[in-house]
Amino acid sequence: MRADFYLPATVGIVFFGIFCALALASLAGKYYERKQGFDVSNMVKEWNARVASWWVITILLLVTFWIGRGGMIALFVAASFATLREFISHVYRNRADHLTIALCFYILLPLQYYFVLTNWFSMFTVLIPVYAFLLLPIIRNMAGDPSQFFDRTAKIQWGVMITIYCLSHVPVLLSLEIKDYASPNIVLLLFMLVVVQSGDVFAYLWRRTGSKIAPPRTLPSAYISIPLSTLLATCLYWITPFTPFQAALTGLMISLMGFFGNEVMRAIKRSLGIRHWGHAFSTHSVLDRLDSLCFAAPVFFHVVRYYWT
């Protein structure tokens, strides 16, 4: 594991490109806002809100990249706490669930990131899928009130898996010993973030109607967003340990996982009768912005760990 978490030149180049893209996106949003005058469409308002959230996320990432591994872990501890809170606030629960929920926030979350911090991969991998999966129903059952037991327990388990377990795979990338890779692992982490989040942007820009689950996003948007994200990953191969072909395959894999992860989370929101998980970013929540990453990060981590370490 490398400890030299300065800001490499490659990271600076990528961030410069991100800031340029965000500046163009901001100018485009302001242009259409002024063009429409007082009757600004919801699409323009949503676009400007999304761009503002991307600015916040990008600046937070830049600061944590400067701080290093500790800053990145702290950032995702906060992200897991925020996303779990957003998720739990929308699933059915009553007083009998309080102890189980407290266990998730104040025991499982700190433990999971402690294992990330200490590079305890075996416990990091099994704490939530094995021990928490078995323990949470036991704690819930001890509280009594068997009404909708399976439904309520499954929702809490799902929330813990997505918001704690899956998100914790982002900072744990920094702990890998990658063969023949001269750059700090933080560069590889940036590669994953850029490709996955760009897929979200491309899908949003090219979304079409017609899906029964979520009208704004359909397979036609996947036909555009996934190839563009894969092309971007191929162009960024030089900051990774991958060859251009490997970067393309990896980009395709995480783009697919990110797209369908977003689809799954949108389907869950529809089933709960909500449009967004919250309003941390004006019109969207933290989980709304990170849902694709929740699905892409674990797959990316394990592929890199098994084939490049």
Predicted segments with their positions:
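Transmembrane alpha-helical segments of integral membrane proteins
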Residues: 261-276
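Juxtamembrane helix-loop transition sites at the ends of transmembrane segments
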Residues: 71, 107-110, 283, 294, ...
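Juxtamembrane boundary at the C-terminal end of a transmembrane helix
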Residues: 302-309
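Interfacial loop-to-transmembrane junctions
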Residues: 272-293
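Hydrophobic transmembrane alpha-helical segments of multi-pass transport and channel proteins
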Residues: 255-263, 289-294
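Membrane-embedded alpha-helical bundles of polytopic integral membrane proteins
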Residues: 1-257
